Amino acid sequence: MNAVIEFRNVWRHFDRQPVLRGLELAVKPGEVFALLGRNGAGKTTALRILLGFLEPHTGEASVFGVPSGALMPAERERIGYVAEGHRMYLEMRVRDALAFEAGTRPNFERAAAERELERCGIPLRKRIFFLSRGQRAQLALILAAAGAPDVLVFDDPAMGLDVVMRRELLGSLIELLSERGCAVLLSSHILTDVERIADRIGILHGGELLVDAPLDELKRRVEKRQWIPSNGAGLPELDGLLRARRVDGGYELTLLDLDPLDEARLRAKAARLSERIALDLEELFLELTTGEETHG
């Protein structure tokens, strides 16, 4: 199945500083891709390039095989977008927001949106200003989904919501995805939510995509080992070494895709090499995006 979202060698600079460095990723229909990264990693920039709000300096982002900047109105109608903060006209009533969407988006399913709003307990007559944060987030999701999109793009949709609000929003999103089967590109800081919904995870750091894989595969590929050298031996050069943290008598190593030859090098100089220590998503994320390697 062909990808409907693609980034091919995308670079973008601000003030001559690279924010994206050769970004490559693809999302197929029915797939949820979660793009993770610390603040300033380039997540929002990537989404804005995909939606045609920014141009890449090198490379290309495309949707439905069409470069983002060349998408026609009919193709844009097939894309739903929910931005961080759920920016809306706060003085509008909910029913006015529905009327606006129906007037500007030919595929907008107003009756379906009204049914979903009723299910969520959001009154049509209420001004958006007086909705809770959670209700605004649900309204933004319903408006994006009611256009029958083939692609959904979310930029931190649960930012600022409490646990209960996030759970309700995530439940709505999971239900929506099961019905639609659309391709989803999601950026988020909330790792527990990502674990529930994502088919694949990409971790962006310093504008580079460090990994791109299903969570179970990432957990297999990234590991920790305790390494105690024999007779004062130095730490060997390892292609997959992410971090080496000094501990009593040796190092705690974080390794990506440790190959048998590197493991043999470690064992040859080890008084003790522990078995692999598996990481959860939060530990994996922190190991990939914080700290520096220590050698010596």
Where are these regions (language model features)?
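Residue-level marker of structural boundaries
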Residues: 81, 122, 224-227, 290, ...
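Short loop/turn segments at beta->alpha junctions
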Residues: 93, 214, 277-280
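Generic alpha-helical secondary structure signal
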Residues: 18, 73, 111-115, 216, ...
